[in-house]
């Protein structure tokens, strides 16, 4: 899963970048720095060097082919009330497109403090498995998916590409998540064999006990994150 023989560059960044760096270094990665045009003029981000521009990657592809990359820009579901959400989402896919179009080596980061079964588990490239997560036997994790601390995924579950499972998300066994699913903090899919469709947004602390439709928002308050949570959605 973790290929530490090739030096690592973070493409894009976020306010929690040092946690990614800490885990990468603990695993044994040699972190060369960050490439992020938003911060290139500053020459660093939170004391981590900004080493090039995104155009440099394309113009000097042969040089950068000796590195591997991890996209560190986060995305959130689109929210017209928070302009930064839409921009981060657009930036995220732009950076992923650079990595794919230039066929760069893609890193996967799995914390040594995560509990990952050795039995028929697949974790896709570009994904992040945080500390104290449980990945159970026969689980399949897609590409570019971020699974944050204390997430517990039951056996024989599938998580698609470009998903975000925020802290303390819980999935029962046999659950399947499509692509670009966003599970909020403390959200729960408690019924076995439930399917969470592409682009579903499950708000924090919501419990889901049925299949969802593509693009569905699971909340009693639409997209207003200020409203009350901790309710069960069953019908």
Predicted features, each with a name:
Residues 2-75:
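A solvent-exposed beta-alpha-beta segment
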Residues 166-235:
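Glycine-rich hexapeptide-repeat left-handed beta-helix
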């Amino acid at each position: 899963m973790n290929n530490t023989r090739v030096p690592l560059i973070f493409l894009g960044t976020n306010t929690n970048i040092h946690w990614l760096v800490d885990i990468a270094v603990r695993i044994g990665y040699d972190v060369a720095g960050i490439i992020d045009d938003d911060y290139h003029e500053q020459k660093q981000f939170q004391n981590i060097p900004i080493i090039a521009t995104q155009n440099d990657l394309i113009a000097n592809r042969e040089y950068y082919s000796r590195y591997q990359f991890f996209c560190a820009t986060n995305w959130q579901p689109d929210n017209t009330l928070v302009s930064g959400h839409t921009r981060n989402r657009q930036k995220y896919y732009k950076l992923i497109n650079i990595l794919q179009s230039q066929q760069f080596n893609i890193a996967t980061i799995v914390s040594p403090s995560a509990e990952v079964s050795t039995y028929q588990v697949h974790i896709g490239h570009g994904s992040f498995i945080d500390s104290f997560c449980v990945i159970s036997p026969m689980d399949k994790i897609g590409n570019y998916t971020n699974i944050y601390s204390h997430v517990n995924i039951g056996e024989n579950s599938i998580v698609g590409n470009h998903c975000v499972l925020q802290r303390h998300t819980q999935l029962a066994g046999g659950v399947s998540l499509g692509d670009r699913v966003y599970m909020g903090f403390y959200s729960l899919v408690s019924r076995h064999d439930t399917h969470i469709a592409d682009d579903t947004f499950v708000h924090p602390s919501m419990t889901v006990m049925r299949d969802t439709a593509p693009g569905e928002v699971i909340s009693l308050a639409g997209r207003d994150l200020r409203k009350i949570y901790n309710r069960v959605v069953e019908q």
